[in-house]
């Protein structure tokens, strides 16, 4: 488990609790306690908002909540209970006055569900809005990207093609949706990269990564350094070279023990590539002049 990070710890702007459909081990109160132990200045509870009905086969079905798998074998993510979530945030703000607690959502594929996403954002004031891509349309429907590496992908789809398709769709998401401020986990496919293919090398996909980063920088938005896995440092370097102005740190924790995971190493890496703490402890990290 992480030890106290210290006074220079960045905020954790990507955290899930029991209010996200895939965080059965989540607890907002326990996560707040852990954030204070680590010395985090603030935390953003960015709960999932997903509307994509994913194709599931074999092992993938067994890993999902069974009550959400339809008779057609597709998965229907549960809807966020906005009122219950906001009430829980207020209880935690009262209980943990020394921790700045931000509201937030992680919009899955917001460019595919613009009306739903816009209506959700109008329903309540959210401090942090992440845009994320978890899915790709292949053959008979949308597939979770990490599941495509498990041998259940349509015939002929290779790991390299999954990564390139993912990054191409991420460009389309940035260019066609202005509903989010922070791009979450640009390296999401790395989570499922097959060991048989050797270590993941981002340089093999440099052109595709740079296309995403140029689009994001041109829109004035923020790149997340997601610490679920160590971010390939090349990506942060390309972000700086693309004119990116800001970085957000997110553990993507789905249980309290993982909040702030990997932040000390990630902060050192980000600083070595030209970014530093912003205007105050609660700000994004900003590009050095």
Placement of each model-derived feature along the sequence:
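Domain-core and long-helix interface of multi-subunit machines
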Residues: 19, 107-111, 123-126, 131-242
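Short helix-capping segments at alpha-helix termini
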Residues: 94-99, 242-243, 275
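An N-terminally biased module of ancient metal coordination in phosphate/nucleic-acid-related enzymes
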Residues: 1-111, 191-202, 211, 250, ...
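Hydrophobic residues within beta-strands of alpha/beta enzymes
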Residues: 43-45, 129, 183, 223, ...
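Short, acidic/polar
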Residues: 24-34, 111-120, 165-174
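Extended hydrophobic/aromatic segments used for targeting, binding, or gating
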Residues: 228-264, 268
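Short, surface-exposed connector motifs at secondary-structure boundaries
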Residues: 97-102, 215-223, 246-249
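Mid-to-C-terminal alpha-helical segments outside catalytic/metal-binding sites
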Residues: 261-289
């Amino acid at each position: 488990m992480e030890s106290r990070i210290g006074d220079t710890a960045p905020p954790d702007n990507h955290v899930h609790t029991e209010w996200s459909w895939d965080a059965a081990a989540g607890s907002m109160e326990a996560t707040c306690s852990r954030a204070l132990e680590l010395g985090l200045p603030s935390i953003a509870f960015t709960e999932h908002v997903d509307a994509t009905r994913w194709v599931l086969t074999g092992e993938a079905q067994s890993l999902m909540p069974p009550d959400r798998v339809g008779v057609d074998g597709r998965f229907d993510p549960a809807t966020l209970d906005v009122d219950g979530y906001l009430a829980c945030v207020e209880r935690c703000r009262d209980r943990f006055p020394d921790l700045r607690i931000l509201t937030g959502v992680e919009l899955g594929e917001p460019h595919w569900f613009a009306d739903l996403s816009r209506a959700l954002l109008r329903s309540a004031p959210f401090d942090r809005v992440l845009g994320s891509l978890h899915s790709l349309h292949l053959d008979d429907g949308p597939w979770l990207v990490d599941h495509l590496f498990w041998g259940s992908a349509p015939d002929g789809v290779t790991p390299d093609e999954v990564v390139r398709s993912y990054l191409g769709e991420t460009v389309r998401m940035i260019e066609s949706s202005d509903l989010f401020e922070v791009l979450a986990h640009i390296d999401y496919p790395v989570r499922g990269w097959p060991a048989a293919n050797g270590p993941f090398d981002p340089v093999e996909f440099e052109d595709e990564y740079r296309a995403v980063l140029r689009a994001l920088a041109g829109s004035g938005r923020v790149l997340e350094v997601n610490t679920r896995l160590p971010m390939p440092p090349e990506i942060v370097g390309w972000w700086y070279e693309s004119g990116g102005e800001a970085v957000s740190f997110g553990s993507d924790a789905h249980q309290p023990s993982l909040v702030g995971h990997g932040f000390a190493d990630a902060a050192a890496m980000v600083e070595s590539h030209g970014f530093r703490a912003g205007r105050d402890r609660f700000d994004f990290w900003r590009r050095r002049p």
